[in-house]
Amino acid sequence: MVREICRDEAFLAQKAEPAMKDDLGTAQDLLDTLLAHKDGCVGMAANMIGVNKRIIAFDNDGAYLVMLNPVIIRQSEPYEAEEGCLSLTGTRRAKRFRSIKVQWQNEMLQTRLKTFTGWTAEIIQHEIDHCEGILI
């Protein structure tokens, strides 16, 4: 189900709680909402649809991916980026890394581990910042 975009900065600034099996419906809603906004958005976190859970969805080079409880476990090659957000107006500068190794759970709650680079890595870092309550 496509949900309304949350623009409440106080809510967005809260650190997300771990996602559980009961949150799989939220994961699907997040993906549905991202697809509905794909012309102007490449990634979303659950707090952007008003749910304070550690779930992200993003465009992974044309194939959409949902991550539950994502954690960056390694990062390299820092750089400065300028990013916008569907939940906030304007753009902001952020420190990012060209390569990140992420551990997460898929929709079957299986643990996954993968290295992402470039634009996809930047998207993931932005969405994980949302999970941490960091406004970008």
Residue ranges and their predicted role:
Residues 1-136:
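Positively charged
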